[in-house]
Curated annotation (Swiss-Prot):
This is Endo-1,4-beta-xylanase 1. Keywords: Carbohydrate metabolism, Glycoprotein, Glycosidase, Hydrolase, Polysaccharide degradation, Secreted, Signal, Xylan degradation. It is an enzyme of class 3 (hydrolase). GO terms for molecular function: endo-1,4-beta-xylanase activity. Residues 1-21 form the signal peptide. One of its GO terms (cellular component) is extracellular region. Residues 38-234 form the GH11 domain. Belongs to the glycosyl hydrolase 11 (cellulase G) family. Its EC number is 3.2.1.8. Its main location: secreted. Endo-1,4-beta-xylanase involved in the hydrolysis of xylan, a major structural heterogeneous polysaccharide found in plant biomass representing the second most abundant polysaccharide in the biosphere, after cellulose. It is found in: Secreted. It catalyses: Endohydrolysis of (1->4)-beta-D-xylosidic linkages in xylans.
Length: 234
């Protein structure tokens, strides 16, 4: 089947403005919860002290909303299109311990992951905690494994050729840690992700992240699927 490893042109274009790790703007816009006829329009920004990123290609009926603190919700239907949204930080860094909790109920192809980008070199990365019907490990080259936060993860890489990114159309690598077994989707979910544990393991396998950090969020993604996600990050 076609892999769910897709790129988000509009999201990447919006993220370019944050590609250089500058001090965070202390003036935050109000929470984003605008609806349109096809759902919530794509947007990025800050909400209650957290960076958020939301992108949809418009093919699905999708509603994304930021709540208080690190909370966001996403409801999508129609089994069409691509979408991804979540809350976290911009810039990311390699020692953050991320807590998440909430509800994750995918129906079809979807991920719940720590997700982000670096530059120099350009790397897109995932730490996948749970997923729906499609295991991302099936479309990637396995490099090894690591135990982080009491769970085993498969470490994998893929390469994207001439694809959109936060730095324009590029060829770049994707780095993956995929929890094995995954956390069960379909209801309440929570966990802790020590990013440094994964990043150190990747480095030991020659998978080196870039020196400049872009955003780092806990994201819900969907591809030709439906579902509901309400996640709080801290």
């Amino acid at each position: 089947m076609v892999s769910f490893i897709f790129t988000r042109i509009i999201l990447f274009a919006a993220a370019i403005n944050g590609a250089v790790a500058l001090p965070m703007n202390t003036t935050e816009p109000e929470d984003f919860s605008i609806l349109s006829r096809s759902g919530t329009p794509s947007s990025t920004g800050y909400s209650n002290g957290y960076y958020y990123s939301w992108w949809t290609d418009g093919a699905a009926q999708a509603t994304y909303a930021n709540g208080g603190g690190g909370q966001y919700s996403l409801n999508w239907s129609g089994n069409n299109g691509n979408l991804v949204g979540g809350k976290g930080w911009n810039p990311g860094f390699n020692g953050r311990v991320i807590q998440y909790s909430g509800t994750y109920q995918p129906n079809g192809n979807s991920y719940l992951s720590v997700y982000g980008w670096t530059l120099n070199p350009l790397i897109e990365y995932y730490i996948v905690e749970s997923y729906g019907s499609y295991n991302p490990s099936s479309a990637a080259a396995r490099k090894g494994s690591v135990n982080c936060d009491g769970a085993n993860y498969d470490i994998l890489t893929t390469t994207r050729y001439n694809e959109p990114s936060i730095n324009g159309t590029q060829t770049f690598q994707q780095f993956w840690s995929v929890r094995n077994p995954k956390k069960n989707p379909g209801g309440s979910i929570s966990g802790s992700v020590s990013t440094g544990c994964h990043f150190t393991a990747w480095g030991n396998l020659g998978m080196n992240l870039g020196s400049t950090w872009n955003y780092q969020i806990v994201a819900t993604e969907g591809y030709q699927s439906s579902g509901f996600s309400s996640i709080t990050v801290a």
